[in-house]
Amino acid sequence: VMACEDELSWLDMHINVNKTFCIRIGPKYRVDPAKIVTRSGLEIEWADTIRYLGIYLRRHCVFMCCLDNHKRSFYRSFNAIYGKIGRVASEEVIIQLVQSKCVPVMLYCLEACPLKKSQLQSLENVIVNCFMKIFHTRSKETVNDCIEMFNLNVRKLLDRRRVTFLKTFATRNDRNTACCAFKARCMADLHCITV
């Protein structure tokens, strides 16, 4: 912390302990961490989840994103749309609005996050629940057919977004060492996805 504070003071900045949190990621994530105190004597809190650039990161043994806020934002926008036009608009119109307004909210930055199968399944369940509401059915087969027909399969959407993200990053001409290492990883991931 002292090294960070030295750099920040050189830039005429300081650590705002009201907006700064620490999170532990790794095998010892459950161990109670030591308190971190700034030079001014203020304590930086440890958190279970933190928000960084719109993504919520969770304290865990591996780097992991928390999708609760993504799903909550999706449902908020879906309910706003469905509450206004659900009874008067056709299913196609509602799905087009969901595709253009709600899905981007749910998938925001997830192309850069590693997701587990259970997390992907929970995102798929969000879409399934919405389709059940739109088409007034409880049939999984019907809903899955509709999801494929309207091209709203979450795994396919994320794969497309991930390919675009990796291609964009792979074509950058950045000489930073960390960026070069990540670029090599992007190329390998891109090869795995497209094969």
Region locations from a protein language model:
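Short amphipathic alpha-helical coiled-coil/interface segments
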Residues: 4, 122-131, 162-165
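A glycine-rich phosphate-binding loop feature that marks nucleotide/adenosyl-phosphate handling sites
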Residues: 19-28, 122, 145-152
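Basic, alpha-helical interaction scaffolds
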Residues: 41-114
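Short helix-interrupting loop/turn segments at helix-coil junctions
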Residues: 10-17, 132-142
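Catalytic palm subdomain of template-directed nucleic-acid polymerases
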Residues: 1-9, 27-28, 61-63, 115
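Short, conserved micro-motifs composed of acidic
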Residues: 13-49
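Acidic catalytic cores of enzymes that act on phosphate-bearing nucleotides/polynucleotides
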Residues: 139, 152-195
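C-terminal, helix-dominated tail/subdomain
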Residues: 127, 136, 146-157
